[in-house]
Regions:
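Long, well-ordered mid-to-C-terminal structural blocks that present hydrophobic/aromatic surfaces
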Residues: 89, 93-119
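Alpha-helical packing segments of well-folded alpha/beta enzyme cores
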Residues: 3-4, 24, 102, 122, ...
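Non-catalytic C-terminal accessory modules of carbohydrate-active enzymes
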Residues: 115-194
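Short alpha-helical patches at coil-to-helix transitions and adjacent helical residues
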Residues: 57-61, 100-103, 150-154
Length: 194
């Protein structure tokens, strides 16, 4: 809701809806940590986190923008790192596991947290196991046609190289030590900066 409120204010649209959205936002619960200090996947007490699940929607605030509620709270940042690492423990046992897009979600989160080796592991798994010889991407290793990583893979590389938001450009925020040299040009950042 914060994003739609901000976008509406910037664009001068939906002014009558902003108070409704602000009221809804005020009633929403804050992020929560589970008993292991990981950010909770589910808010309901009776629902336990499922670290084997292919999605990581509880880390949404780290995908394409960095939620200030997370980024300014050391406990939440640590909780997100723990959640990513817990899911990675399971994926490392299976060299990535299933569902490429779930790995993209974890990798985006790792980039936001500066976890370069975790992001690099996922980039490597995705590059080695989720493409057929004809360069068609797959949902699972080498099977089930799926286009998710066609956009996710290059986006992951970019997130490892640069992060931007209004008023901030961060170069090499998640560069793994394996990338010792190189260059890139023509990168389009938020705000039309190239």
């Amino acid at each position: 809701l914060r994003s739609v409120i901000e976008a509406s204010q910037v664009l001068g649209v939906n002014q009558d809806k902003i108070p409704v959205w602000e009221s809804m936002q005020a009633k929403m619960p804050s992020y929560m940590l589970n008993e292991n200090g990981e950010i909770r996947e589910w808010m309901w007490k009776d629902l336990q986190d499922n670290h084997k699940h292919r999605h990581a929607s509880h880390l949404f605030g780290l995908y394409d923008f960095h939620d200030p509620l997370i980024m300014k709270d050391k406990d939440l940042l640590e909780g997100c790192k723990r959640a990513v690492n817990r899911r990675m423990e399971i994926r490392r046992q299976d060299n990535g596991g299933i569902m490429a897009f779930g790995m993209i979600q974890l990798a985006f989160s790792a980039c936001a947290l500066g976890e370069s080796e975790t992001a690099y592991d996922m980039l490597t798994w995705l590059g080695n196991s989720y493409w057929n010889n004809n360069m068609v991407s797959t949902h699972d290793p080498k099977k089930t046609f799926n286009l998710d990583i066609c956009g996710g893979y290059p986006s992951l590389v970019m997130k490892m190289l640069v992060y931007s938001e209004p008023g901030l450009i961060s170069l090499l925020p998640c560069k793994p030590q394996q990338w010792r040299s190189g260059h890139i040009n023509g990168v389009a950042l938020r705000g039309g900066i190239i």
